[in-house]
């Protein structure tokens, strides 16, 4: 095909079929140059809509604006978009660029669905699978898991497999929503350069377990567990005793820390100082949160450890005797006896326990809800992997998967 003919066809395609929503005025100019080069007489339909995130509070209205030809400097009837594709902005920066920054990609995905195209294909973070800020992502997660029009999804544990210079905590995924598709999703996981693919009902759980083989193990185990008989029911919530991560430096701390044990300051507190576990002392009367557990035997578990791909999954647990509390760095599990606490530690150290936690873990954080697929046991005795594999009827293949995935805690 001659160059003139190629350019003519591309010009016609741009005019009739390509419409780009840009997040900044500068992006409009970049889009024009990318699509049309220096053909200044060509029509390039790229628009910037001010305060677009505010407008997304009413997505039906915004969708009507986008389908209005006047928005794109065109005439005629309302536009019907056949496909929506893109890599939307991921988050509003809260200052740190970390996990507390508000996600916004879900708004663009929901807007795409509101436009009612035949196809949607977006690249977005995978954090919505099982974590993220619940008030912002829970409805989006529920909608995605129950959408039987999602025909394909590919998840990458390492975002650099897609964008070599960009690290996105929790990885990335892209998906295809096909209005004509109705049924299971062809799901692929790319991890360590290997791809595994399986047909999946995304709505099997209230989260999306990233690893298909692990999803099958979780399903088998949970079929044998009664409601509310899982470890999340005994693990504390965040900041369990109201003490921040480093009580010396935090301006939010209302508890005074002392480095010497005394009759007045008789409760030990485990906290993190310069990345080192440190013990100090506090007054019993200064603990206002979960004070009834001060005189119970406890197991302290780091709230954050490694990453969503870490083969250890949870941090090193620590037995805490009666008369102890911890900072925000840790969660805790209370027990009536030291033996029960130490037997729980034996359970936590098993690969069985930790692989079930990993089903929910997609970042470094491990809140109590991440223990929801781990069944409770009789803690009058210690536990081993061999006992647990037999108790829940795991196959040789399932055991081999766990053994290859999870490393022992030394």
Regions found by a protein language model. Name each.
Residues 1-153, 158-162, 171, 175, ...:
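SAM-dependent methyltransferase catalytic region
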Residues 12-15, 324-328:
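Short glycine-enriched loop/turn motifs at secondary-structure junctions
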Residues 18-20, 331-334:
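Short cationic amphipathic helices and targeting signals
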Residues 31, 344, 402-403:
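A structural signal for short hydrophobic/aromatic patches embedded in well-ordered alpha helices
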Residues 159-327, 333-396:
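C-terminal substrate-recognition regions of SAM-dependent nucleic acid methyltransferases
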Residues 400-410:
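Short, amphipathic C-terminal "tail helix"
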């Amino acid at each position: 095909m001659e160059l003139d003919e190629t350019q003519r066809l591309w010009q016609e395609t741009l005019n009739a079929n390509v419409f780009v929503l840009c997040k900044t005025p500068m992006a409009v100019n970049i889009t024009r140059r990318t699509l049309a080069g220096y053909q200044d007489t060509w029509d390039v339909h790229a628009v910037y809509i001010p305060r677009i995130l505010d407008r997304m509070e009413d997505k039906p209205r915004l969708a009507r604006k986008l389908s209005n030809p006047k928005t794109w400097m065109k005439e005629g009837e309302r536009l019907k978009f056949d496909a929506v594709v893109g890599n939307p902005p991921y988050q509003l920066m809260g200052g740190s660029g970390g996990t507390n920054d508000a996600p916004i990609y879900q708004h663009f995905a929901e807007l795409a669905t509101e436009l009612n195209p035949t196809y949607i294909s977006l690249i977005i973070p995978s954090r919505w699978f099982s974590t993220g800020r619940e008030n912002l992502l829970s409805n989006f997660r529920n909608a995605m898991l129950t959408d039987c029009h999602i025909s394909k999804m590919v998840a990458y544990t390492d975002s650099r497999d897609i964008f070599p210079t960009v690290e996105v905590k929790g990885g990335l995924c892209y998906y295809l929503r096909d209005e004509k598709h109705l049924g299971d999703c062809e799901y692929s996981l790319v991890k360590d350069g290997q791809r595994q693919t399986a047909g999946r009902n995304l709505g099997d759980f209230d989260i999306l377990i990233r690893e298909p083989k692990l999803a099958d193990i979780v399903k088998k185990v949970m079929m044998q567990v009664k409601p509310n008989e899982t470890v999340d029911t005994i693990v504390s919530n965040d900041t369990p005793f109201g003490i921040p991560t480093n009580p010396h430096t935090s301006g939010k701390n209302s508890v005074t820390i002392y480095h010497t044990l005394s009759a007045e300051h008789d409760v030990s507190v485990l906290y993190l100082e310069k990345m080192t576990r440190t013990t100090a002392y506090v007054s019993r009367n200064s603990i206002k949160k979960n004070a009834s557990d001060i005189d119970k035997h406890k197991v302290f578990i780091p709230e954050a450890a490694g990453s969503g791909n870490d083969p250890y999954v949870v941090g090193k647990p620590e037995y805490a005797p009666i008369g102890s509390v911890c900072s925000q760095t840790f969660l805790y599990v209370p027990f009536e006896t030291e033996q029960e606490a130490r037997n729980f530690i034996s359970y936590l150290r098993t690969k069985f326990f930790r692989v079930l936690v990993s089903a929910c873990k997609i970042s470094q954080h491990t809140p109590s809800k991440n223990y929801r697929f781990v069944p409770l046991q009789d803690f009058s005795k210690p536990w081993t992997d061999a006992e647990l594999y037999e108790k829940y009827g795991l196959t040789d293949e399932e055991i081999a998967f766990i053994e290859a995935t999870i490393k022992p805690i030394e």
